[in-house]
């Protein structure tokens, strides 16, 4: 059997999508550049609820830069979001679907200028948009700024968030010449430690905050100033263990399975993706075992993204989303009984056969895409995603 060159080849060689994803030894998401814990993940979680927490984003997110006179027009072809109100110094949480209306990815888009859009998020979003950018006649140019899972010397910008009830006061104090008023999901520009930075006003852990970014060479000086002043505000830095739990705090589903693995309509994309791409290396794990991987796909409505689906423009997946607008499943939080959790953990360590599976803390994440069955009286009544 020849070595697969692209994702489509890899799927065929594995005998199907499910076989490929189940056989992969690629584990849960990796957050390079930061230690698992700076103090303890409990204290770090507590800080974004009671004081302020620094969440490092400089190393693990992929960026795609879209430049040109048609940058907005290009993105509007693939994003379900309203785009006619996009102006410089605003951000949007983009929702990207395939032709069948299932989610490919979400990501954050920063409108730096009328002809410059910065896409930041998982590689699935950048891959999807880059593929289509290479097949368009519109006046755009795209460049990638890769994450640091594979080590590299530098990136275009650093990026970190300050989240929690003390975040606003902290940012006001570290701003050299005062903090401009920044509305929700707007971007402001100011100086920290003599360096010009920008900040997107939004929350990631269910609390108010800022996402601050600026030139890579300013990272150490800006972060040092924030940490120095932050000590007075109870600042904690989040390690990778605590960082991975922020989605649960806000109800955001960080990494659902992208709907790109099936269908002739996505075949050319799979043939474009390298076999060793994120999508090609990814694994699926959990108790939800299916023969048809599309059973694991999710729709924007199911993720509470309905308010970001705007039908006043044409985009990929529009007709499918309109057809199933009222038939989506409902996203809820599954809260486990504490006594049951600790009983299962105890039985996984000291009980003789059969032992239970250990529930890893602070998050039970064992694969790239974690999908479990929710059972009631022996019947499956739902499925869970991280």
Give each language-model segment a name:
Residues 62, 66, 99, 104, ...:
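Short coil/turn segments at secondary-structure boundaries
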Residues 1-94, 102, 331, 373, ...:
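Acidic, proline/glycine-enriched N-terminal capping motif
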Residues 62, 70-75, 92, 103-108, ...:
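Generic hydrophobic, aliphatic-rich segments that mediate packing or membrane embedding
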Residues 1-27, 31, 36, 109-386:
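Conserved, structured C-terminal
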Residues 44-50, 96-106, 138, 191-200:
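Short amphipathic beta-strand starts and helix->beta connectors
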